[in-house]
């Protein structure tokens, strides 16, 4: 299994269990997820090691809730954040500067293609700004990558977009 982490914050963003494809001439990865519902807080009687009490109401003290969301977000504990268009422009400018610095250290051959392609991709993001939900890693590092969540034309299938050069891969 491959875990994809944020190059700057080192937060886990997604893994290779999802359908992943390159978009924007290899600049970004599009990761397709699905909507899931999970029950949280339920306690299985078989784990208690005894019989359920004959007295008192059934299930007393065990509250369970059903949580529905996108599997990528839930599995990797991504945190939703919000931006105005102006705030996102400021964030993405700072993020590109940080990422450019990291690329100059680690992959200097990627700096020029990344900076050229990123400008086009950012224009596309800003043109479709209202379609996106924004997510950051579990540690909520404001300098890390902000992943974009959108839905296919069917309105049901979620997908997330990540800058490929902002990711590091870890084999498990």
From Swiss-Prot:
Residues 70-172 are annotated as: Required for reduction of TSC22D1 protein stability. GO terms for biological process: negative regulation of ectoderm development; negative regulation of intrinsic apoptotic signaling pathway in response to DNA damage; response to virus; spermatogenesis; stem cell population maintenance. Involved in calcium binding and microtubule stabilization. Acts as a negative regulator of TSC22D1-mediated apoptosis, via interaction with and destabilization of TSC22D1 protein. It comes from the Eukaryota. Disulfide bonds: none annotated. The gene is Tpt1. SUPFAM superfamilies: Mss4-like. Residues 1-172 form the TCTP domain. It comes from Mus musculus. It holds the Pfam family TCTP. This is Translationally-controlled tumor protein. One of its GO terms (molecular function) is DNA-binding transcription factor binding.
